[in-house]
Amino acid sequence: MLEKIKLFILSVIIAIVLCWMSKIYAEEPQTLSTCREAEMEDINLLAAVAEREAGNQGEDGMRYVISTVLNRVRDKRFPDNVHDVIYQPNQFSVVKTKAFQTAVSQPRGDCIDAVLLELKEQINTEVLYFNGGGYPSYGTPLFKYKDHYFSK
């Protein structure tokens, strides 16, 4: 029970910090609950992409995929928010599946844990691309982790 309370408190703190860091205030003033809902949506999207892209790659494998999304959000060549990075055409093919939509609405606990860990301390701040069949023809190869090849 204590662990669930700690996890809840940590997720609220992370949501508040993410809200503060995001551009959510740029359009119109938001209440904390509206901001928290927006950030929880991002957490669920990150958990879903981690599950569907790397759910069989262990915690670090999922974290590398989450890092890819977070690094893209900060990179000027990509959209500046989690939703648009994940749904950008021809990037994460899993978004077109029913399984992805299920993962968004019912995220796995281990995937949420991976997101929260990644938001607390990012495992890698360089990765922008990954591929399951070898290094892509674009970007600079960085490393292979289990079945995925990561590049910047």
Predicted regions located by residue number:
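Bacterial extracytoplasmic/cell-wall-associated proteins, especially those involved in peptidoglycan
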Residues: 27-152
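N-terminal secretory targeting signals
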Residues: 1-41, 152
